[in-house]
């Protein structure tokens, strides 16, 4: 009986006139059920010991009758269908939007619906989402429950919810407007903040490096100039802190950092600029200024010293620094004079 049933249905389908749309629909439904084995009695028991994979399907109605003006299909699909793809990946299910209004071209949808083909039979049903799961029984029902809970969020007719806002941002990003996307904007702002914070840090590094020639301030006659070097350390750090005040009159060879861009708009290459300038200004600018271009740091230190107080550093001029080598022989000769008295006979 079953062997003859399918050929009879196919012959009856071919004999029907295309104008009998309802008859063709019923015949196609019967053929589809027979091919899928749905005509057989369904199993009433689930064997959880064997844990065999089972197929679970559920149709979720889309409330287009209650909210006819809301585009539920667009919200479910998202930009380029990415929202529905991510929803399937998260829930580990297969989802399909079927029924009336599931196709964008209404004329083609009506044509396919009247064609009577089995794969387009769903166009006669109401608009719905078909959720299918193929997994062990416990996992299949767990996935189905998760999918029903997640898809419920997409069936709320709200234009300003989090899902809609995320889709608009993604659509802007896909259309080439990366400056309005979330990730580039956050990175661009972070780089602007680091620029404003690290500028004094760079000057501190310069002050710390230029504090090497502190021996210039060693007064005459001090027997232990090394102790003075340690006491002059905090003064050098103070100079580094006051260097931003001296930037109004930049010394020769000084190259000020470029001004940061405005935060209102972000250009096309803001993503690259965010990381490139952040590392250049924070990490390597101080080393380049102090080691690769020592003349810049020396000039900065020299101008600051003379601009702060010339009278205080008159006794520590360049002549004393160049003639500091003669201090040691003069001190030795003085010590030798004291030693000549007990050993004068030799």
Swiss-Prot record:
One GO cellular component term: nucleoplasm
Keyword set includes Magnesium: no
A Pfam family (short name) is: Sam68-YY
Q: Which SMART domains match?
A: KH
Maturation and modification: Phosphorylated on tyrosine residues by PTK6.
Q: Where in the cell is it found?
A: Nucleus
Record protein name field: KH domain-containing, RNA-binding, signal transduction-associated protein 3
């Amino acid at each position: 009986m079953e062997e003859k049933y399918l050929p009879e249905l196919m012959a009856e389908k071919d004999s029907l006139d295309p104008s009998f749309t309802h008859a063709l629909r019923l015949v196609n439904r019967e053929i589809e059920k027979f091919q899928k084995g749905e005509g057989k009695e369904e199993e009433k028991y689930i064997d959880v010991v064997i844990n065999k994979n089972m197929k679970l399907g559920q149709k979720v109605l889309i409330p287009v009758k209650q909210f006819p003006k809301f585009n539920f299909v667009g919200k479910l699909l998202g930009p380029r269908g990415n929202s529905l793809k991510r929803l399937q990946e998260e829930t580990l299910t297969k989802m399909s939007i079927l029924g009336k209004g599931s196709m964008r071209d209404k004329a083609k949808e009506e044509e396919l619906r009247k064609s009577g083909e089995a794969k387009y039979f769903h166009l006669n049903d109401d608009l719905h989402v078909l959720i299918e799961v193929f997994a062990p029984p416990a996992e299949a029902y767990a996935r189905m429950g998760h999918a029903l809970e997640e898809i419920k969020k997409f069936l709320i007719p709200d234009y300003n919810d989090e899902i809609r806002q995320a889709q608009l941002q993604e659509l802007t990003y896909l259309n080439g407007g990366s400056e309005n996307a979330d990730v580039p904007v956050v990175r661009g702002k972070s780089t602007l903040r680091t620029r404003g914070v690290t500028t004094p840090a760079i000057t501190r590094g310069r002050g710390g490096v230029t504090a090497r020639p502190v021996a210039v301030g060693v007064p005459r006659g001090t027997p232990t100039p090394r102790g003075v070097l340690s006491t002059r350390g905090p003064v050098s750090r103070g100079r580094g802190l006051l260097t931003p005040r001296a930037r109004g009159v930049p010394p020769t060879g000084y190259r000020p950092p470029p001004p940061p861009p405005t935060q209102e708009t972000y250009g096309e290459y803001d993503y690259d600029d965010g990381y490139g300038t952040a590392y250049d200004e924070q990490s390597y600018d101080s080393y380049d200024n102090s080691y690769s271009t020592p003349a810049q740091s020396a000039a900065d230190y020299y101008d600051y010293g003379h601009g702060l107080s010339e009278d205080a550093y008159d006794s520590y001029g360049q002549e004393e620094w160049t003639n500091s080598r003669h201090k040691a022989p003069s001190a030795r000769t003085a010590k030798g004079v004291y030693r000549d008295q007990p050993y004068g006979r030799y």
